[in-house]
Amino acid sequence: VAMILGDLGATVVHVDPPGGPLWQSPANATLNRNKLIVNIDLKVPEGVEQARALIGEADIVIENFRPGKFAALGIDFGALRGERPELITLSIPGFASNDQERRELRAYESVIAASSGVFTDMGLNRVLMGVNPSFSPLPLASAYGAMLASSSAVLALQSRERTGLGDHVEVPLASAVMEGLCYNSIKIEGLPDRYITQREREIARRRVEGLPMNLSYEELQELLDPFYRSYLCKDGRMFYVVCPSHKNHAKRCLQALGIYEELVAEGLTEEQDTYLPTAEWQSDVSLGVYPLPKDWADRIAAKMKEVFLTRTAKEWERIFGRGRFPGAPQRWLQEWINDDHAETSGLMIDVQDPEYGTMIQPGPVVWLEESGEAALSPVPRRWVDVSTALSLLKKQKTKLPRVTDPDDRSGWLEGVRVLDLCNVIAGPHSVSYLARFGAEVIKLDPASPLYDSWNTVIFGISHMRGKRSALIDIKSVEGRKALHALVQSVDVIVWNAPDNQIREMGLDAETLGKINPDAIFCKLDCFSGVSRGPRTDYVGYDDLVQASTGIMTRFGGSMHEPEEHAHVGTIDVMCGFGGALGVATALYQKLNTGRVGRGRTSLSANSGLLQIPFCYDYLGRGLFNEPSGRYVPGYDALTRFYYTASGDYLLFSSNEHDIPSLDALEEFKGIASLPKDERDAFLSGIFAGDTSPAW
C-alpha cells in the first residue's frame, strides 16, 4: 500500500523491527522503494515513543497486525484520532476485527486463501482434472487488499480536503479476496442453458452419472470455446485467443485467419439481436456470443488449429494487435520482465537498489498522465535513523480547511457525479466501487450492445450496483448531443478504451478541456504504462494479460499446457480498484492544487503487483523457480497441503523461525535435526495420523 502511495509522490517512512523484515526476499527492494526505512522495537517503551513521534507528523498511518495487537503495543488508533481528528488510520488485518472465529489466526497469505476457499475454487479445469485443492503462489488476498486499501486511503484523503476530518479504514485481506473473486462466485438458479459452458455441462454430467473427474489436459481443450483458448503456433509457442462475447472481435479474428467466408458458407450466422431468447433466433448459433454450441465450437477450432500452425506466435500477436482483436503469445514471467514493450512503456523499470544493484522492478500500478514520468525513476530504499525520518516528515506541511462539522459522517464522494462509459469487468467495477462511497453514477451503454448478455447482464449483477443507467446511440446526432450534455454535467468520466477511440469521442485532454475544463478523466486499458510502447493500443482482457505476463504458464506448469488462473476477473477487479485510485488521486490533486488531472491504470500494470513476490530481475538472480503446475502442493515442506486421516487436506503454514517451537511438541519431535529434504516425508507421516479437525 505504502509503495503505491510512494509511487504517487507520498513521503513514506517504513518501520521494520530491529532484526529487519520477517519476510526475507528481494521483493522487499520493490515494496520499499521511495521509502525511508527505520528500525524500531515496538516492544519497548522507547520504541513506542519513537513510533508515536513519527505518527504525530503523518497524514496517514498504516498497520497490518492482528486486530487489537497494535493497540496492545501502546499505539491505539482510536485514541490517536481523538487527539488528531485529521489523522487517517488504515488497518489491514488478515481477518476482520469482528470475525470472532478467525481474527486471532496468524493470517499468512496461504492461510487466508485456504480459509476463504480460494484453493478449492481454482477454475473449471482443475475440477475436471480432479485436482482439489489446488495451490497457487499468487498473493491474491494481499494484492486485492493493497488496491482496496490504497484507494480507500486516498479517497479518505481527498474527502479530508473538503471536511478537514480524517477517518479510520479497515481492509481485512479475507474480505478483499472475496470481493476480488466475486465474478467467480455468481450462482443463479434457473440460469438459461445459453450461458452454460461445455466444461460446466461436463462437470454436471459426471456428477449425475457418478463418473470420476479425471480428464487430461488434452481432453479439456476440446471443451473450450474456440475464441477462448490457446493454439500451437509454427514456432512451438502457444498463442492465446480471447475473442468471445464481442460483436466484432470474433469476426475480425476469423477474417484474419482466412476462414470466415468458408464458415459462413457452412452455415455460421450472426443474429441481429442476441438479447432475444434463443428460441426466437433464426439459427442455433451466433458469431460473437459466448459460449458457442459444441458442434460449431469443434468445427471452428479445428480450422483455427490448422491456420495457427502457419505462423509464429509473434507474427500472430502483431496481426491480432493491429487488427484490433485480442490475442497474445503465452510467455514466462522472466520473458515478460525483459520484454521490449514492458521496458519501453514503463511497465518494468530499472531501480538502482543498494543491495542488488541495477534491478528490474514492476512500474507504477496507477499514475496521472500529467506527472507519471516521475514514477519511472523511484528513489531506492534507504535506511536512516529515526531523527532523520522525523525531520523529513516535519518538512511536509499540511494545510487543511476549518472543520465546520466535527460529526460529519457523509460519504467520501458525496456530491461527486461520475459518468461511466466502461464495459466488461475492470472499468464498471471501478465505478461501482466509487458509488458505494456516495458518488452519483450514470452508466451509459450503447443502444445496440457490442457485447453479449453474458458480459453485460451476468457480470452486471455485480458491477451495476449503485448506478443509474441509460442506453444511447452515440453515433446519431441526438445521441452525441446527449453524450455532450452528460459530459458537461459531471465531475469525473471513466472509460476503458484505447487512445484513438477516446480522441474520436472528444474525450482527449485538449477536447475535453473545451467541453468541461473541470472534469477529471480516468482511463483503464490492457497494455498501457506511463510511456507509450509498441503494444499500448492493443486491445485485450484479463486472460490476455495472464497469458502475456506468465501467470498462465506458471499455473499450468509448462509452455504447452498453460491454464487460466481461476475463472474470470483475476486481475480485472484489482484494475478496477486501480481505476478508483486514479480517480481519488486526481480528485485530491484538484482539491489540493486546483489542477485537473487524468488518472491511468492498466491490467498489465496490475499484473506486476499480483506477481510481486517473483517479479524482479538482476544480475546474479537465481532461477525463476516459483511454485508452478497443477500438482504443486505449496512453497516447501513448511507451507503446503498435507493429506490427513479424515480423507481431506490440511494447509500447514509455518516457517524456519517456528522449527524450535515445533520440535518442542511431542508430535513433531525431531524435526529440528532433520535435513530439509526429509521434512516433507516426515510431516506427511505425522499429518496422516489424525484428522483435519483434530489438527
Identify the function of each model-found stretch.
Residues 156-218, 228, 332-333, 586-630:
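Substrate-binding/catalytic subdomain of NAD(P)-dependent oxidoreductase enzymes
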Residues 205, 211-213, 217-218, 232, ...:
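Terminal low-complexity tails and localization/encapsulation signals of metabolic enzymes
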Residues 11-12, 321-336, 441, 695:
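Short, well-structured beta-strand/strand-turn elements
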Residues 1-165, 314, 384-595, 619, ...:
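N-terminal helix-loop segment corresponding to the beta1-alpha1 unit
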Residues 94-96, 173-179, 235-237, 244-248, ...:
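Glycine-rich beta-alpha junction loops
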Residues 217-223, 227-323, 638-695:
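Aromatic-enriched alpha-helical interface/lid elements that frame and gate functional surfaces
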